[in-house]
């Protein structure tokens, strides 16, 4: 009888020990470290930070107005891992573009306003931007562009978000998932906010 009582008390003690020990053990959340690179263009007078997983294209030129009106700049193409398994095109990117030697800078110099783009102004982090977006489609693909033109500068700079993706309804069911657009835009926003104009 006493042995049974002793064993019962021992079992209860062990359970209480593990219960309070586990409660006091902190849970450690592993936060991925984003390695950042900085691109500096001393000729065009700007620098910008971007994740190391993005691909830098310093020979980038925007040709939305035709090859004769190429806007020079630099682009940062999304990592393949973001697009894999989704309907997002792996050629989506964010770019910094600069039009030199002009006295008046307008958003219409960076995006075709005849396609329904309606400019508006935002203030983000104390910086004023003129913003306009456009969409296009072809062969089952969708193309979205949003341009941010920095206001109040003596030189003409813009940041472009270019997102290409396939219409999700055109894929066999279960083949891909719809890409996380808010997360992608958040990543682009972070890069945009890091732009520093040095001239």
Regions found by a protein language model. Give the residues of each.
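N-terminal "mature-domain start" segment
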Residues: 28-73, 119-127, 195
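Active-site beta-strand termini and strand-to-loop segments that position acidic
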Residues: 41, 78, 150-152
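Surface-exposed amphipathic alpha-helical segments
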Residues: 53-57, 162-199
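Short, surface-exposed polybasic-and-hydrophobic patches located at secondary-structure transitions
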Residues: 65-88
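Hydrophobic single-pass membrane-insertion segments
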Residues: 16-28
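Signature of long, low-cysteine stretches enriched in small and polar/charged residues
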Residues: 87-170
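A structural detector for beta-sheet-dominated domains
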Residues: 49-51, 57, 77-79, 97-99, ...
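N-terminal Sec-pathway targeting helices
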Residues: 1-11
